[in-house]
């Protein structure tokens, strides 16, 4: 049985008990959210996860970190270190998005070392093999679509991005639209190219029932990819974006009927004033399925600092109901991220998630804020560093410009806390 089916029967899995403890929430609430599809607990039956996560309505906002090779840089050891760093700094899940090298070896290595759920995009494997053999990323057969899904499932992948919402009708409309950047989703572009080249329907959409059978066998959580997500704020919230979302609604209903866990992926580049609209429409149209957002980025002009733009958009999106934030690194739109980029990206998105949790009234989030406030009041620097989401940088800054007395080198004897302590 899948986690959803277990919950529907009124029983609890070991993973449910563990996330209930982490979330400090009643187990019955966990079961209800999973049973109705308002939450997902990604956990392949073949993957032992030390730190399972629950994503959805009423739970803490989660953060995903993307790692993976490219044609220019494909070091397995570097990707393994990225995975370790991402987990160390609080990533709740990883996605292995490699497009070069021995993809199966890389994927299995990350799954083996990961204490958190691991996701993937199976279509990348088909595209890479096609490019290596024929120098064309879309020259593969319909069978390759499902075969790659099976391969990833057998390796232990917990959740998969499947771009099943791009139908021939959706694709025709985007081709004739006024969009500046027609398709910026890599997986979405590969599938769109395949559909145009072969003049056929999207196999992920056409064979979605078969896909559900595979997902159910392994308890894979399907993450319905938004192939039509906007790649610039100028294309945000357009007809094409929401047309695909209505197709995804249909697929959510099918998945739930089958007992398969499912969530929706979302944009993308969205101006700040449209974040609330996008999140609430995704929840409404998607029948309260969990929402997994890339960013969102409220400006296109933050190159080199996109992780900061991402944190701004992510905090607001989380407040309005987004459940799962995919981090963005300083290398976004520029290059393959380094290990340091991964660290910075995770910290930025964890800050966004913490801000959202606080604004949503999460008790655990408020308790942590109280501990930080008390630590500051008592000049307990070690405790402050432990509570900080950027603990290493905080400690480094403190040591670089020390103050020999209580307080810090910013205020010295003019410290407001010390003055109040003495005279109040």
From Swiss-Prot:
Instruction: Fetch the Gene3D superfamilies from UniProt.
Output: Radical SAM ThiC family, central domain
State how the cofactor is bound: Binds 1 [4Fe-4S] cluster per subunit. The cluster is coordinated with 3 cysteines and an exchangeable S-adenosyl-L-methionine.
List all membrane-crossing ranges.
Answer: none
Q: Which Pfam families match?
A: ThiC_Rad_SAM
Keyword terms, alphabetized = 4Fe-4S, Iron, Iron-sulfur, Lyase, Metal-binding, S-adenosyl-L-methionine, Thiamine biosynthesis, Zinc
- What's its catalytic activity? 5-amino-1-(5-phospho-beta-D-ribosyl)imidazole + S-adenosyl-L-methionine = 4-amino-2-methyl-5-(phosphooxymethyl)pyrimidine + CO + 5'-deoxyadenosine + formate + L-methionine + 3 H(+)
Query: Which NCBIfam families does the record match to this protein?
Result: PRK13352.1, thiC
Q: Which cofactor does it need?
A: [4Fe-4S] cluster
EC number annotated for this UniProt entry: 4.1.99.17
- Provide the residue positions that the database annotates as binding Zn(2+): 269, 333
Q: Does the keyword Ribosomal protein apply?
A: no
Q: Mind telling me what this protein is named?
A: Phosphomethylpyrimidine synthase
Q: Which HAMAP family match?
A: ThiC
The positions annotated for binding [4Fe-4S] cluster are 408, 411, 415
Q: In which pathway does it act?
A: Cofactor biosynthesis; thiamine diphosphate biosynthesis
- Which family does the record claim for this protein? Belongs to the ThiC family.
Q: Which cysteine pairs make disulfide bonds?
A: none
Function comment: Catalyzes the synthesis of the hydroxymethylpyrimidine phosphate (HMP-P) moiety of thiamine from aminoimidazole ribotide (AIR) in a radical S-adenosyl-L-methionine (SAM)-dependent reaction.
């Amino acid at each position: 049985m899948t986690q959803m089916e277990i919950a529907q029967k009124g029983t609890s899995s070991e993973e449910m008990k563990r996330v209930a403890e982490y979330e400090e929430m009643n187990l019955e609430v966990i079961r209800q959210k999973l049973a109705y599809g308002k939450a997902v607990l990604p956990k392949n039956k073949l993957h032992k996860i030390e730190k399972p996560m629950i994503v959805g309505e009423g739970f803490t906002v989660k953060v995903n970190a993307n790692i993976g090779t490219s044609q220019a840089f494909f070091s397995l050891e570097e990707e393994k270190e990225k995975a370790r760093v991402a987990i160390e700094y609080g990533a709740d899940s990883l996605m292995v998005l490699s497009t070069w090298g021995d993809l199966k070896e890389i994927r299995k290595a990350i799954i083996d070392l990961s204490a958190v759920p691991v996701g993937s995009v199976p279509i990348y494997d088909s595209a890479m093999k096609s490019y290596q053999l024929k120098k064309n990323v879309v020259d593969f057969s319909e069978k390759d679509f499902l075969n790659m899904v099976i391969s990833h499932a057998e390796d232990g992948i917990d959740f998969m991005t499947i771009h099943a919402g791009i139908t021939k009708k959706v694709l025709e409309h985007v081709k004739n639209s006024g969009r500046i950047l027609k398709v910026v989703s890599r997986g979405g572009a590969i599938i769109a190219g395949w559909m145009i080249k072969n003049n056929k329907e999207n196999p992920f959409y056409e064979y979605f029932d078969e896909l559900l059978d595979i997902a159910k066998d392994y308890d894979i959580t399907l993450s319905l990819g938004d192939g039509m997500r906007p790649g610039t704020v100028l294309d945000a919230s357009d007809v094409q974006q929401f047309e695909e979302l209505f197709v995804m609604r249909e697929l959510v209903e099918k998945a739930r009927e089958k007992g398969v866990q499912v969530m929706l992926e979302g944009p993308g580049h969205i101006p700040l004033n449209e974040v609330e609209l996008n999140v609430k429409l995704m929840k409404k149209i998607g029948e309260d399925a969990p929402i997994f957002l890339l960013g969102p980025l409220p400006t296109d002009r933050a190159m080199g600092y996109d992780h900061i733009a991402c944190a701004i958009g992510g905090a607001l999106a989380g407040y309005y109901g987004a459940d799962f934030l995919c981090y963005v690194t300083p290398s976004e739109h520029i290059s393959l991220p380094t290990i340091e980029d991964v660290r910075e990206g995770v910290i930025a998105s964890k800050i966004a998630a913490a801000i959202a949790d606080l604004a949503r009234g999460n008790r655990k989030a408020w308790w942590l804020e109280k501990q930080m406030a008390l630590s500051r009041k008592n000049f307990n620097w070690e405790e402050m560093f432990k509570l900080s989401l950027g603990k290493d940088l905080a400690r480094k800054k403190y040591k670089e410009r020390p103050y020999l007395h209580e307080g810090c080198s910013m205020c010295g004897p003019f410290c407001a806390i010390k003055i109040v302590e003495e005279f109040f």
